[in-house]
From Swiss-Prot:
Subcellular location: Mitochondrion matrix
Organism the protein comes from: Glossina morsitans morsitans
Self-association and partners: Homodimer.
InterPro entries: Citrate_synth-like_lrg_a-sub (IPR016142), Citrate_synth-like_sm_a-sub (IPR016143), Citrate_synthase (IPR002020), Citrate_synthase_AS (IPR019810), Citrate_synthase_euk (IPR010109), Citrate_synthase_sf (IPR036969)
Transmembrane spans: none
Other comments on record: Citrate synthase is found in nearly all cells capable of oxidative metabolism.
Classification lineage: Eukaryota, Metazoa, Ecdysozoa, Arthropoda, Hexapoda
Catalytic site positions: 303, 349, 404
Stored Gene3D superfamilies: Citrate Synthase, domain 1 (1.10.580.10), Cytochrome P450-Terp, domain 2 (1.10.230.10)
Family: Belongs to the citrate synthase family.
Protein name per UniProt: Probable citrate synthase, mitochondrial
Pathway(s) served: Carbohydrate metabolism; tricarboxylic acid cycle; isocitrate from oxaloacetate: step 1/2
GO cellular component, one term: mitochondrial matrix
Enzyme class: transferase
Pfam family, one: Citrate_synt
Length: 465
């Protein structure tokens, strides 16, 4: 039986009543219920819960905004509602209340596998429930059935020059998929706003199903002279089909892909890609247009290119200090990097203040499957050396490694050497979180986003009062 998880810790009487109401819906949902059925049963009670919460506490002040926050990328401003995940500075990301280690324990794995299936994580993000293995297999089959690309998108992908960046191809193909948007058609036909979520859900399921085919086509066209299978095997899970279409057949790489697609899926709602999807979606752009916009943000070097920068830095380090540098050589190179005005890529995070659990689970995977790999051993040495040096500078709030410090090393080990492609993998994964959030945006009837902006002159006048 599925496990129902409530995402709030508030103990207000009205919330407790609504929780009981929500539980009454859940009691009638069997372990074999479809994802859509489970979600549909939860939405009315959640709508009522949010409605009553806003009615009772709508004027509650969440914090203050400073001038530095406005000029500093809005860091720390509490201004968004995202149900799918919350990032704790000390514990890292929690998906609907579950940490990454907890997800690894309770989410179903493939037969013979150990890592959680992304289908199960999507179920968790969308419903707040841990699904049964049967429910996860149901999602795998449904995504396989929805995966075929329309011919105009296939033609488009095959006509792109191989010199076009993979993320440009990815974004363009996703945009072109909106030709068949069910939400756009329903909106044009005058569907009632209470039904918006249903059509956003359908588009999101279609899009997630098609992304591995789009991404694999880009990979094969750009790096394999078009060679590769684009056929979907309905007996395989989402990740296994993706790996097969990419042209890889190592079961351990498939396990890595399941882990990778799970841990990169969501990271609150304030990062560039997640916020962009929410923002564009708030204008009632369909999921294809909204997600494509988010992918254009992910393509930016400050967001989705970090794991490439880590690998470039590691290769430069090896070139200068050798493939097996001593601790003293590492310290010398790291200080050289810092004194030149650069950062050590893969270290630090805007929110986290401890080692990123996404780094930790990748390290555990490497320790199990590739402990003697030269690049992994170098990353392990750096893990010991960098934090104390960054602490010594006194300028870094978080000296610990983040997810990007490790992911590229694992992909390199299994033969995926094409660094320009890594952000596409990130994008395929990120769809799980941002599209689950987009469904809830429409289910809760969130309005178009329109914050107030001020000029520097006006700010100066305000502080002089």
């Amino acid at each position: 039986m599925s496990i129902y998880r409530i995402s709030t810790t508030r103990k207000m009487p009205e919330v407790q009543k609504l929780n009981a109401l929500l539980a009454s819906y859940v009691r009638f949902i069997s372990a074999d219920s479809s994802l859509r059925d489970v979600l549909a049963a939860k939405i009315p009670a959640e709508q009522e819960r949010v409605k009553n919460f806003r009615k009772q506490h709508g004027s509650f002040k969440m914090g203050e905004t400073t001038v530095d926050m406005m000029y500093g990328g809005m860091r720390g401003i509490k201004a968004l509602v995202t149900e799918t995940s919350v990032l704790d500075a000390d514990e890292g990301i929690r998906f609907r209340g579950l940490s990454i280690p907890e997800c690894q324990k309770v989410l179903p794995a493939a037969d013979g596998g150990e890592e959680p299936l992304p289908e199960g994580l999507f179920w968790l993000l969308l419903t707040g429930e841990v699904p049964s293995k049967a429910q996860v297999k149901q999602v795998s089959r449904e995504w396989a059935a929805r995966a075929a690309l329309p011919q105009h998108v296939v033609t488009m992908l095959n006509n792109f020059p191989t010199s076009l960046h993979p993320m440009s191809q990815f974004s363009a193909a996703i945009t072109a998929l909106n030709h068949d948007s069910k939400f756009a058609k329903a909106y044009s036909d005058g569907v009632h706003k209470s039904k918006y979520w249903e059509h956003v859900y359908e588009d999101s399921m279609d899009l997630i199903a098609k992304l591995p085919v789009v991404a694999a086509t880009i990979y094969c066209n750009t790096y394999r002279n078009g060679k590769g299978s684009k056929s979907i095997d309905s007996s395989l899970d989402w990740s296994a089909n993706f790996v097969k279409m990419l042209g890889y057949d190592d079961p351990k790489f498939t396990e890595l892909m399941r882990l990778y697609l799970t841990i990169h899926s969501d990271h609150e709602g304030g990062n560039v890609s997640a916020h962009t999807v929410h923002l564009v979606g708030s204008a009632l752009s369909d999921p294809y247009l909204s997600f494509a916009a988010g992918m254009n943000g992910l393509a930016g070097p400050l967001h989705g290119l970090a794991n490439q920068e880590v690998l470039v830095w590691l290769r430069k380090l090896q070139k200068e200090a050798g493939s097996n540098p001593s601790e003293e050589q590492l310290k010398e190179y790291i200080w050289k990097t810092l004194k030149s005005g650069q950062v050590v890529p893969g270290y630090g995070h805007a929110v986290l203040r401890k080692t990123d659990p996404r780094y930790t689970c990748q390290r555990e995977f490497a320790l199990k499957h590739l402990p003697n790999d030269e690049l992994f051993q170098l990353v392990s040495k750096i893990y010991k050396v960098v934090p104390p040096i960054l602490q010594e500078t006194g300028k870094v709030k978080n000296p610990w490694p983040n997810v990007d410090a490790h992911s590229g090393v694992l992909l390199q080990y299994y033969g995926m050497k094409e660094m320009n492609y890594y952000t596409v993998l990130f994008g395929v994964s990120r769809a799980l979180g941002v599209l689950a959030s987009l469904v809830w945006d429409r289910a809760l009837g969130l309005p178009i986003e329109r914050p107030k902006s001020l000029s520097t002159d006006l700010l100066m006048k305000m502080v002089q009062k």
